[in-house]
């Protein structure tokens, strides 16, 4: 048999075994990392299609390679769907990731040395919003803003810093923040100082698509997002912008940042955008929010407080909960490991003014999108929230909690058709 037509399990059993093991891990544990989700089988089929073979530098109708007539159709479908989904004038669906979408947007709007403002990483921002060792911190003069004592973005500080430093770009967005941002207020500040407003909605784009979170598109000059978090599609990025900025954005992506787009991923994005426009998706996003609120409410009860556990801002408006462990006997790493032990995957996360190192931290970021995609109901979320609360106590029964997790995982089978 030609190697071209040899199945993975025959051609490379080592890689196949690792893939099978990962499938088993996803099926048998509860995924609660806020930035992770489960892509529909149709999305994975598109991403694993023959489109992976095609080079297509350029844009639909304007390629530097022949034979692009079919990938042109696919990419235009993706563009049209995401524009309709968010009400955008322009969309570029080629960025390979959210970080590259942010980089391209900044390249389109800025020159090296220009001043930008973004939420401080330790207060919930993202690497690409101005971290010193990231491209954004190296190429631009970064003025970070912060959360106040209540754990929410201090808009008075944003306005003051903007007037003092006159940034060319203000970034509104986050990677670990449990509340909604006031996009109109950000735009007002941006207009007052002559800055562009860029919103990074990577985490909450699915909620926006479902009409359960304010849409930043009417307020921002540019909006970036990933396609795999709450949107639940393939791993990739998208840039939305005004029509006025379309040419700058496209040029910054290609040839500015990337060469050939990954058209198999673009196809998967197109499928994900169709899913995101469905009633099923909207219902799922509702359960995502409900699950996060149930979790937050469980972790502010007296028994959790007695264990030194608290919830930043006292609750959540989005798909994640930030747990503060500064008064607990556990640090973030230990808490992550303990939940992993019982079958729940989360990630340690810094809290504002965290006294511990970044690889240890004093907090956890816990999200509900993947479990909502899996079919979890309010009753299921109440059960998993109780398991988490019990696991974070000084004394816990690991075996009993593992059994409860297994019951939940078995109740909601994941990708049963993929089992060999």
Swiss-Prot record:
<dbReference type="GO" id="GO:0035999">
    <property type="term" value="P:tetrahydrofolate interconversion"/>
</dbReference>
<feature type="binding site">
    <location>
        <begin position="125"/>
        <end position="127"/>
    </location>
    <ligand>
        <name>(6S)-5,6,7,8-tetrahydrofolate</name>
    </ligand>
</feature>
<dbReference type="GO" id="GO:0005737">
    <property type="term" value="C:cytoplasm"/>
</dbReference>
<dbReference type="InterPro" id="IPR039429">
    <property type="entry name" value="SHMT-like_dom"/>
</dbReference>
<feature type="site" description="Plays an important role in substrate specificity">
    <location>
        <position position="228"/>
    </location>
</feature>
<keyword id="KW-0028">Amino-acid biosynthesis</keyword>
<comment type="pathway">
    <text>Amino-acid biosynthesis; glycine biosynthesis; glycine from L-serine: step 1/1.</text>
</comment>
<feature type="modified residue" description="N6-(pyridoxal phosphate)lysine">
    <location>
        <position position="229"/>
    </location>
</feature>
<keyword id="KW-0808">Transferase</keyword>
<comment type="pathway">
    <text>One-carbon metabolism; tetrahydrofolate interconversion.</text>
</comment>
<dbReference type="GO" id="GO:0030170">
    <property type="term" value="F:pyridoxal phosphate binding"/>
</dbReference>
<keyword id="KW-0663">Pyridoxal phosphate</keyword>
<dbReference type="InterPro" id="IPR015421">
    <property type="entry name" value="PyrdxlP-dep_Trfase_major"/>
</dbReference>
<dbReference type="InterPro" id="IPR015422">
    <property type="entry name" value="PyrdxlP-dep_Trfase_small"/>
</dbReference>
<comment type="similarity">
    <text>Belongs to the SHMT family.</text>
</comment>
<protein>
    <recommendedName>
        <fullName>Serine hydroxymethyltransferase</fullName>
        <ecNumber>2.1.2.1</ecNumber>
    </recommendedName>
</protein>
<feature type="binding site">
    <location>
        <position position="121"/>
    </location>
    <ligand>
        <name>(6S)-5,6,7,8-tetrahydrofolate</name>
    </ligand>
</feature>
<keyword id="KW-0963">Cytoplasm</keyword>
<dbReference type="Pfam" id="PF00464">
    <property type="entry name" value="SHMT"/>
</dbReference>
<dbReference type="InterPro" id="IPR001085">
    <property type="entry name" value="Ser_HO-MeTrfase"/>
</dbReference>
<dbReference type="GO" id="GO:0019264">
    <property type="term" value="P:glycine biosynthetic process from serine"/>
</dbReference>
<keyword id="KW-0554">One-carbon metabolism</keyword>
<dbReference type="InterPro" id="IPR015424">
    <property type="entry name" value="PyrdxlP-dep_Trfase"/>
</dbReference>
<comment type="function">
    <text>Catalyzes the reversible interconversion of serine and glycine with tetrahydrofolate (THF) serving as the one-carbon carrier. This reaction serves as the major source of one-carbon groups required for the biosynthesis of purines, thymidylate, methionine, and other important biomolecules. Also exhibits THF-independent aldolase activity toward beta-hydroxyamino acids, producing glycine and aldehydes, via a retro-aldol mechanism.</text>
</comment>
<dbReference type="GO" id="GO:0005829">
    <property type="term" value="C:cytosol"/>
</dbReference>
<dbReference type="GO" id="GO:0046653">
    <property type="term" value="P:tetrahydrofolate metabolic process"/>
</dbReference>
<dbReference type="InterPro" id="IPR049943">
    <property type="entry name" value="Ser_HO-MeTrfase-like"/>
</dbReference>
<comment type="subunit">
    <text>Homodimer.</text>
</comment>
<dbReference type="GO" id="GO:0004372">
    <property type="term" value="F:glycine hydroxymethyltransferase activity"/>
</dbReference>
<dbReference type="InterPro" id="IPR019798">
    <property type="entry name" value="Ser_HO-MeTrfase_PLP_BS"/>
</dbReference>
């Amino acid at each position: 048999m030609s190697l071209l037509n040899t199945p993975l399990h025959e051609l490379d059993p080592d890689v196949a075994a690792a893939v099978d093991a990962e499938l088993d891990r996803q099926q048998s544990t509860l995924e609660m990392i806020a930035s992770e989700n489960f892509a529909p089988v149709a999305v994975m089929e598109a991403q694993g299609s023959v489109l992976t073979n095609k080079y297509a530098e350029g844009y639909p109708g304007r390629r530097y390679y022949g034979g692009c007539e079919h990938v042109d159709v696919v990419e235009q479908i993706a563009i049209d769907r995401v524009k309709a989904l968010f009400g955008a004038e322009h969309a570029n669906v080629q960025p390979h990731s959210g970080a590259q979408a942010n980089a391209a947007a900044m390249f389109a709007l800025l020159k090296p040395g220009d001043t930008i403002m973004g939420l401080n990483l330790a207060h919930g921002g993202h690497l690409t919003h101005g971290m010193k060792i990231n491209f954004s911190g190296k190429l631009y003069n970064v003025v970070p803003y912060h959360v106040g004592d209540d754990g929410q973005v201090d808009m008075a500080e944003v306005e003051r810093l903007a007037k003092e430093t006159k940034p060319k770009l203000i970034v509104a967005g986050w990677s670990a923040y449990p509340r909604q941002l006031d996009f109109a207020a950000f735009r007002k500040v941006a207009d007052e100082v002559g800055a562009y407003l860029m919103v990074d909605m990577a985490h909450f784009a699915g909620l926006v698509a479902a009409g359960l979170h304010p849409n930043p598109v009417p307020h921002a000059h540019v909006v970036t997002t990933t396609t795999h978090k709450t949107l639940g599609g393939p791993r990739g990025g998208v840039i939305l912008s005004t029509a006025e900025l379309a040419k700058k954005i496209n040029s910054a992506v290609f040839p500015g940042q990337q060469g050939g787009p990954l058209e198999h991923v673009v196809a998967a994005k197109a499928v994900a955008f169709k899913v995101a426009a469905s009633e099923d998706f909207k219902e799922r996003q509702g359960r995502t929010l409900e699950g996060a609120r149930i979790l937050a409410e469980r972790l502010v009860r007296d028994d959790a407080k007695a264990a030194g556990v608290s919830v930043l801002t006292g609750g959540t408006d989005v798909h994640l909960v930030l747990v503060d462990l500064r008064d607990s006997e556990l640090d973030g790493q230990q808490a992550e490991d303990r939940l992993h032990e019982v079958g729940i995957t989360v990630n340690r996360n810094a809290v504002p003014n965290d006294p511990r190192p970044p690889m240890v931290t004093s907090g956890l970021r816990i999200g509900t999108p993947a479990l909502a995609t899996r079919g979890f109901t309010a009753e299921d979320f109440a059960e998993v929230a109780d398991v988490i609360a019990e696991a974070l106590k000084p004394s816990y029964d690991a075996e009993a909690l593992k059994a409860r997790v297994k019951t939940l995982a078995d109740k909601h089978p994941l990708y049963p058709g993929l089992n060999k």
